[in-house]
Amino acid sequence: MGFPEAKWAVDQVVSKVGVQPNNMRKFEAVALNETTIGLTFLEPEDSYYSAGGALAAVTKGVLIRMSTDGYPQDINDGTLVVDNTVLGKYENEYFQVNGLTKGTKYYFTAFPYSNIGVYNESLNAANKADAIPNALEKVSVTINIDDTKRFTSTTITLKNVNTSEQTTMNITEAKTVMFEAKATNTYVVTATAVTGYKNGALSTEQFTAVAGGSRAFTFNFEMGFLYGIKFDNGGDGIPSSYEYLEDCAGFTAASVSTMNSWLGKRILDKFKPCLIKPGATAPEYYLNKDNYNQRAEGSTAPILTGADGDVMIEAERMWFKLVKNGDSTATLYISEVELDGYKSFIGNQDVAYRGAYEASVSGGVMRSISGVAPAVNSTRATFRGYAKARGGEYSQNDYYLLRLWQCMYLLLYGTRDSQTAIGRGRSASGNQSAINTGTMNAKPFCWGDTGGSNGMKFLGVENFYGNVWEFVDGLTIVDYVCKITEDPSKYDDVGTSYEITAGTVPSGANGSYIKEMQATNDAPFLPSVVGGSETTYFCDALWTNSGTRVPIFGGAWGNAGGVGAFFWLLRSDASDASAGVGSRLCRKKVSS
């Protein structure tokens, strides 16, 4: 204990000088410019011997002293700054101490005193403050980059909101840079976006610079994945002829449920099974990817039969591009971030939803629930109406979502022979009917076998192909010309209002095997040339006819080899309905 503290304690014990006031309720020092420090303070309240007891000390004022050698130790130490008796005057406004030396640290001690002249000289921390005069605040900005291979540069800007003045620095690597901000001015720090990285332009909240102060900001640049696969498209005819490019160069493709190099990659996290209700802005909850009988979190069993909503796969937005090469190959790229020339799989939505099961219908309303027979024997238009009856955000088996699943299949498995890569699906010629929905609830997220009876599952979607054919909406073939819309409000069976025309399919195909795809962003896997076989090129067949035709995809329970990821039936009339043709519920995101 120092002498002043000891003296104070003794004085209290022997009651030589009466009761001293309590400590300051507020005492702060801040640099205002290169030669001025501002003090804000609030004197102690009057003190009492006990709660509700007699008055012990009445606060009259505060004496503040200053030194450059350390905190003044008593009421005579250092230089007098102010003797204030207007209590509360400087609680929210500065008492300015002028004429100071830039860069020198100044120490202040407050000595509150009573109406009988008793000072609090306890040197309590509440009675001390210090600051260094400086007109500027130092601002550091740190750039972190998780992977630099596509990083070009970002421009960091410190902008003065008051004057519009700004200072910029061009950054090409991970580093920390320093700026200076004028005291009392308002600023914002920004960083421009970098192509290929997940974050867009970055910005801080506005802040007011404090003289002599410092603050630090960090901007993290996380590179989005970019995967590529170059595949045969009418060249050597070998289904397994492909080459992985970009971030998946050197990968080993998936095989049935074994994801090999794709295991744990972020792209698989873009697909999540969930329960979602009409009008909801988010799912009720998510499911265990490899066992729909369990929630992703928590021990409560999920309800897959309708009460908790429809069982659907939530697909996050990604971008893709198809390039048709000059050597009878094509290249598919899938990017986590938007790049020039790339197309969003799901438009401007953050997420979209595709039924985990084939559609069922109850009371004229389409559902995606477990434990029921797939709905069949309706026209495409009728199924469209059933989907709309579920809610304005619903549609049936959107072409743009089917396109996403086709692209993902090719990227993950490489080979165009899907029945070999992931399973035959329910397709054996001896099958007499479709299997019910939910028979693969406990199977892995990607699953299949070679028996032809048990179905298959890809990215959570049961019977991606096989079991029942599925109508596809948003695509209509008019005299072999592909008419496409990505706006479900335009869905019809004639395609006259569809905004995209995407090439032609081969005329007169009658179970002809596909040799070459259009390989464009709008029509990546709509056929352009036939002449393959069940074991060459795309290993899947095509039927076409003239006139206006509604598309059917995938194959059915007894088609043997006639099912697959690229199997198209493009010869059906709008009036066609069949016991082997169903649909699938799809859904847009509902904004909050």
Question: Where would I find each of the regions flagged by the language model?
Answer:
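Structured interaction patches on ligand/partner-binding surfaces of diverse proteins
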Residues: 126-136, 194-223
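Extracellular low-complexity, O-glycosylation-prone stalks/linkers
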Residues: 46-84
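Short aromatic-cysteine micro-motif
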Residues: 302, 306-309, 337-464, 468
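Short, low-complexity N-terminal tether/leader segments at secretion or assembly junctions of large
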Residues: 1-21, 113, 130-136, 218-223
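Beta-strand-rich modules
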Residues: 97-119
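C-terminal, surface-exposed recognition/capping segments
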Residues: 227, 403, 424-440, 464-477, ...
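Pro/Thr/Ser/Gly-rich low-complexity, intrinsically disordered linker/stalk tracts
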Residues: 13-58, 102, 118-136
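Surface-exposed interfaces of beta-sheet-rich extracellular modules
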Residues: 115-121, 179-207
